[in-house]
Amino acid sequence: MTTLLLAKLPEAYAPFDPIVDVLPVIPLLFLLLAFVWQASVSFR
């Protein structure tokens, strides 16, 4: 059952491959946003 599910997952999520490729970058963007926000608050 698990092997069948794992075999079907790539085909089912084929349209979402670009989204999965971008997902690891999102936390880095939030971290960069936090640094920029802190800099703007401290410089005010």
From Swiss-Prot:
It comes from the Eukaryota. GO terms for biological process: photosynthesis. Coiled coil: none annotated. The chain crosses the membrane at residues 19-39. It is found in: Plastid, Chloroplast thylakoid membrane. Pfam families: PsbK. Its main location: plastid. Keywords: Chloroplast, Membrane, Photosynthesis, Photosystem II, Plastid, Reaction center, Thylakoid, Transmembrane, Transmembrane helix. The keyword Transmembrane helix applies. InterPro entries: PSII_PsbK, PSII_PsbK_sf. PSII is composed of 1 copy each of membrane proteins PsbA, PsbB, PsbC, PsbD, PsbE, PsbF, PsbH, PsbI, PsbJ, PsbK, PsbL, PsbM, PsbT, PsbX, PsbY, PsbZ, Psb30/Ycf12, at least 3 peripheral proteins of the oxygen-evolving complex and a large number of cofactors. It forms dimeric complexes. Belongs to the PsbK family. PANTHER family: PHOTOSYSTEM II REACTION CENTER PROTEIN K, PTHR35325. This is Photosystem II reaction center protein K. The gene is psbK.
